[in-house]
Amino acid sequence: MVLEVAVLDVKSGFESDFETAFGTAQHIITGMDGYVSHQLQRCLEKRSRYILLVTWRTLEDHTVGFRGSDRYQEWRRMLHHFYDPFPEVEHYTAVFPASA
């Protein structure tokens, strides 16, 4: 499993619009091959900052499958105009996975 981590700085004053747009756009990733789960969290200290966590089966499911798809173009159209600056996206793999 691969965890995509994106820190999203949304233009001030557009937080509510972004959340609404994300609520609509999230169906785009949920239907992608290799998608496992996602969550969007809002920062308590910086009200315009969010973190998007998406779990994919493989790195390529995100970087090739999703980003190379027509669905990614729709995702961009719906969400990218909210960001300033453009988000840095990194990918992580578990070193010590959670235990039951």
Model-derived features with residue positions:
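Glycine-rich beta-strand-turn "strand-cap" elements at beta-sheet edges
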Residues: 2, 39-46, 76-100
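Intrinsically disordered, low-complexity segments enriched in polar/charged residues with Gly/Pro
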Residues: 14-15, 26-29, 40-42
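Residue-level signal for secondary-structure boundary sites
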Residues: 16, 60-62, 97
